[in-house]
Amino acid sequence: MSDKPGMAEIEKFDKSKLKKTETQEKNPLSSKETIEQERQAGES
């Protein structure tokens, strides 16, 4: 009935088969400086 893998299956899982991937921010947050500059540009 359950779709969850059994404990035995989890224990035999080989982490070395996983590939290391570099995480890349798709939408990095602006720095405080950038936000301040944009605010001042918007006010003038």
Swiss-Prot record:
Residues 1-44 are annotated as: Disordered. InterPro entries: Beta-thymosin (IPR001152), Beta-thymosin_sf (IPR038386). Keywords: Actin-binding, Cytoplasm, Cytoskeleton. Coiled coil: none annotated. Residues 9-25, 33-44 have a biased composition (Basic and acidic residues). Gene3D superfamilies: Single helix bin. The keyword Cytoplasm applies. One of its GO terms (biological process) is actin filament organization. The keyword Cytoplasm applies. One of its GO terms (molecular function) is actin monomer binding. PROSITE patterns: THYMOSIN_B4. It is found in: Cytoplasm, Cytoskeleton. Ubiquitous. Pfam families: Thymosin. GO terms for cellular component: cytoplasm; cytoskeleton; cytosol; nucleus. It comes from the Eukaryota. Belongs to the thymosin beta family. Plays an important role in the organization of the cytoskeleton. Binds to and sequesters actin monomers (G actin) and therefore inhibits actin polymerization. PANTHER family: THYMOSIN BETA, THYMOSIN BETA-4, Y-CHROMOSOMAL. This is Thymosin beta-4, Y-chromosomal. It comes from Homo sapiens (Human).
